[in-house]
Structure formats: C-alpha cells, structure tokens
C-alpha cells in the first residue's frame, strides 16, 4: 500500500480559488440552494439543520449562513401558510402620527384603549422571556417601541414571533397605545405579521457606514444614516421650491429631447448611442439650451426645464457624468435681470428647505446666502492678479493680449494648457488658477471671452467679451447666465469657429446646427438665460460632495 504523504508546506496565507461563474450561472445556483433549503424545511428539518454554514454543497459564491437562515425562515412561513410578502395589511396609522399624538401625553405605565395599526422596519429586537421588545422605524427615521406579550397574543404566536422575526424585517403591529414602565411610548400588540421578510442582514447601524457601502448600496445608507435620508428629502424640497418660484414668475415648464442628432448648448464631450430603428448615431444631450430657445422662437416667452444632462468627462467632488440641471430663458430679459432671478431662486430655496438664508453645512459651519452678492470682472480681476493689463480679443479692430503672451504666462505659472488653444481658453485657465477656488461668498463673475461662449450676445460696450456671468459659491461654479445671442448671422460665425476647433481636435466644440440657425432666422426675441446644476445647488446648501447629493450615483462596477 502506498504511503500517504502529508503536505507540510505553510498554506496559512493561501486563499482558496473562487470558481468563475457567469451572472446567470450564479443566479441559477442560488435558486437551487433556495430550493434545497425549502425541501429540507418541508421534510421537517429545523432551521439549524436546513442551513450549510460552510457551503460545502454549493461553494463560496453561495448564500452565506445568515442569508441561508433567513431563506429557511421564509420557507418555514410558506409551509405554515403565512405569506412572507403579503399584499395588504391593515396599516391605519403612521409611526409619525402616533408619535405626534401621544408623545409627552402619557405617564410611565399609563395605558390607553386606543387601537392603532402601524408598520416599520425592525431595527432592534429583544427577547425577555414572555415579553419581546422591538423598535420599528418609519421611512423618515421616526421610531417607536413595540411590545409583544405571551399574555396578549398567546404562547404559540409568541414562539412563532421569536422564531421568524429578524432585524431588518418590515413588521406590522396592531395594538393599544401605552407608555412602558420606563415611560417609553409603545404599541402593545394584539396582532403581528411580517410585512416583508428581509433576506439580507443589515450592517451594524451603530457604526458609521464605509464609503463603499454608501455609494454602492445607497438603500442601506438611507436606512442607516439620517443625513442621507435628509439629503433625499431636501433635494425634493429644493426642486419643488425652484418650480414654485418659476411658476410665480409665469414660466412654463417643458421637456426637450434627451437623444439628439447633434450635440450642442454647452462645451463638453458627449456620450454617444445608436438608434437601431433609424440606423442613426445619436448623442445624449449635454444641455437643453438650443431646444428651449426654439420655444422662445415659437412664442413661449418664459420657459424652463429641470432634467438630466450627460457629459462624458471627469468625475470629482463637483462633477458627475449624469446630473440634473435647471435651464430657463426669458424673452426681453438680459444677463442682469436673469442674475436677479437666480439670486431669488437660490435664496428662496434656502428659505424653503432650511427656513433661513443662513444654512448650516455638514461640517458644522454656517454659510449666508442673504444680502447683496458681490460682482467682479474676469479681465479686471485677472489683470490685477498678474500685475499687467490683459485685454480682450476684439478682433482686427480691437486686438487683445496675444495667444503667445498668454501662453507664456501660463507656462511660467505652471497652468495646464489645452491641445487646442485660443485667447479665451487661456484667459479662463489663468483666471481659474488665481480665483476659482477662492471665491467663497456668493460672487457673480462677468465679462467672459467671446471665444468660449458661442451662444452668448457680445457685450454692448466691451469688444471681445460677452454678456455672461458665472455665479461662484464656496469656491465652485454654481450657475451661469447670459444675454442670449439671437442674430443668426453672428451665430453662424460662432458655430463655424467652433467647428474649426473641432476639426483641430477639440472634442468639446459644438456642431453646426443648421435647424437651430433656421429657427433663429424666423426670429428669436432678445432674451436672458440661465443654467444651474441641481446637484451643485445641494452642494452649496449642504457642503456635501456631488456624489452625496445624487440618490443613486454612478459607481464603477467591481471586477470579479
């Protein structure tokens, strides 16, 4: 008989190989594991007998032990004829309403005969023999204690409660409103039912969630973190406030195409897609501007849209590839009048969400949106920072500071330069180097170069600049506003200049939109326009990052 030789090498740090499975293969394997657990329960196995803690049968990609146990409880409910996900329960009261009605009204140990039917997620569970305590949480985080007594519901029902209910389950309780002996407002149950069986255990709610869980599983964050729930609610309040203010000023809300045959309305790299029915390449819009201006041509004198835009660019604390914008256009307005509108929009939103122009940021500091807002000129402020005059490029009759000189300044300062450069881009890069992250109080920055603003009307008295402002708050751009270009000949000239930049390799340059030029030819009234990121508005109001303001941010998938 051959000798068996034991492997004496140190394998302590070796990780067992995880089998490779497709998504479908793993899903089928998990269903097979679920069915196996149910068959064991059907055959009379106990909960402990139904689970396989080491996953010997199904391997490391199968359900972990805690999930198996919950799957077994679901199977046990089905075998007992109990729906783990019932269609309807007699929920007659919200936890918030019960709290509002009875908080502070009952003495310790006082009982009422008032019956309520409530439901919430189980966040705490304690077994005290013949009496069980649960803490139920409503969606807004309001909590209440439930008491389940053997005396009230019977031994069998209490045994079933102890056996089936887990943390994270949605639980229905019907019972009397009382105050416990310690004075805790409670519902003393006469009936209970699982409203939705949670198969996945919750993380420890007394610990801070790590960033990966917050971003990859936002629904867990909503359960665990009051700040995340508040962000969702405050975002909704902010959007509602914006709509009210626009409505107060007789603006009409419209929806414009997300899929576009040309990309335009902003300088940004677009996402592309393909429409099979027309065999047509399309762009996800980077801005709704050109369609909203068509509304002005059509006689809708005050128009706005709150919707998604998509830009295939970098991701950081204030930029996301998919984001929500509000854009608005007002016939016979200017960049000055639209600036006053934006100030009103921001201040009213702060009041509607927080009750004050002065808001408290997540780091505990206060920020004041009230009072008058500062205004500076891009060229004047850049000249001051450099100690020399930087002159706008007004064309052959009003030549400005040369591209060569601006480039030399940029190189000396170590300012990043684009592959395709012009006077306007260099001026903006230099200005951003000195000022962008330093404008803390609300500040309108005016007088932008004509080269970087192809859809904006030229300044009435300053050659080479346009009637545009950017609003900076806490060191980042919050909104932008214009006196809109409505001369179709000048607009064609601007489009041609952009097209030449595109041919030279500028991926952010706009296409020539002949249909839009034809619309301008029909006649667009003089107008002011604005754009503001909803996500950035929440950043300004809260101090959060853009990812924290988006309920379901895009996250790079995990590999493997």
What are these regions (language model features)?
Residues 1-560:
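Class II aminoacyl-tRNA synthetase catalytic cores and aaRS-like
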């Amino acid at each position: 008989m051959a000798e068996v030789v034991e492997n004496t090498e140190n394998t302590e740090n070796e990780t067992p190989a995880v089998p490779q499975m497709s998504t479908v293969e793993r899903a089928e394997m998990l269903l097979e594991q679920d069915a196996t657990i149910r068959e064991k329960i059907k055959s009379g196995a106990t909960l402990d007998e139904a689970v396989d803690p080491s996953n010997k049968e199904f391997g490391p990609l199968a359900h972990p032990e805690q999930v198996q146990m919950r799957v077994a409880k679901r199977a046990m409910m089905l075998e007992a004829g109990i729906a783990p996900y019932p269609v309807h329960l007699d929920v007659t009261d919200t936890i918030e309403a019960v709290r509002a009605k009875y908080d502070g009204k009952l003495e310790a140990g006082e009982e009422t005969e008032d019956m309520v039917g409530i439901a919430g997620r189980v966040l705490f569970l304690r077994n005290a023999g013949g009496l069980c305590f649960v803490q139920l949480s409503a969606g807004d985080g309001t909590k209440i204690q439930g008491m389940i007594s053997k005396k009230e519901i019977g031994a069998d029902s209490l045994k079933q409660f102890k056996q089936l209910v887990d943390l994270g389950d949605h639980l229905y309780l019907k019972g009397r409103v009382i105050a416990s002996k310690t004075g805790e407002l409670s519902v003393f149950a006469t009936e209970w039912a699982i409203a939705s069986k949670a198969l996945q255990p919750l993380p420890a709610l007394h610990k801070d969630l790590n960033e990966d869980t917050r971003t990859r599983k936002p629904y867990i964050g909503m359960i665990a973190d009051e700040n995340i729930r508040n962000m969702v609610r405050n975002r909704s309040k902010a959007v509602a406030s914006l709509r009210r203010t626009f409505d107060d000023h007789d603006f009409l809300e419209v929806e414009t195409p997300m899929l576009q045959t040309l990309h335009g309305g902003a300088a940004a790299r677009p996402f592309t897609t393909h429409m099979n029915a027309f065999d047509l390449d399309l762009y996800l819009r980077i801005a709704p501007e050109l369609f909203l201006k068509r509304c002005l041509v059509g006689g809708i004198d005050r128009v706005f849209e709150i919707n998604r835009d998509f830009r295939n660019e970098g991701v950081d604390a204030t930029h996301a590839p998919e984001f929500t914008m509000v854009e608005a256009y007002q016939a016979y307005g200017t960049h000055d009048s639209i600036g006053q509108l934006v100030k009103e929009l921001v201040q009213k939103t702060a009041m509607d969400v927080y009750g004050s122009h002065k808001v408290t940021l997540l780091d505990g500091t206060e920020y004041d949106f009230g009072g008058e807002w500062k205004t500076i000129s891009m060229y004047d402020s850049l000249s001051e920072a450099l100690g020399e005059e930087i002159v706008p490029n007004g064309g052959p009759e009003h030549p400005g500071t040369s591209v060569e000189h601006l480039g030399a300044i940029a190189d000396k300062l170590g300012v990043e330069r684009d592959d395709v450069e012009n006077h306007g881009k260099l001026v903006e890069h230099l200005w951003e180097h000195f000022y962008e992250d330093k404008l803390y109080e609300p500040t309108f920055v005016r007088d932008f170069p004509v080269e970087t603003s192809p859809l904006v009307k030229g300044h009435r008295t300053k050659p080479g600049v346009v009637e545009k402002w950017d609003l900076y708050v806490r060191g980042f751009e919050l909104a932008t506003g214009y006196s809109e270009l409505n001369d179709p000949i000048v607009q064609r000239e601007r489009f041609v200049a952009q097209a030449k930049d595109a041919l030279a390799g500028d991926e952010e340059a706009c296409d020539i939109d002949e249909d839009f030029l034809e619309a301008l030819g029909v006649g667009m009234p003089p107008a002011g326009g604005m754009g503001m990121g909803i996500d950035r508005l929440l950043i300004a109001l809260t101090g959060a990052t853009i990812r924290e303001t988006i309920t379901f941010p895009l996250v790079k998938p995990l590999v493997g």
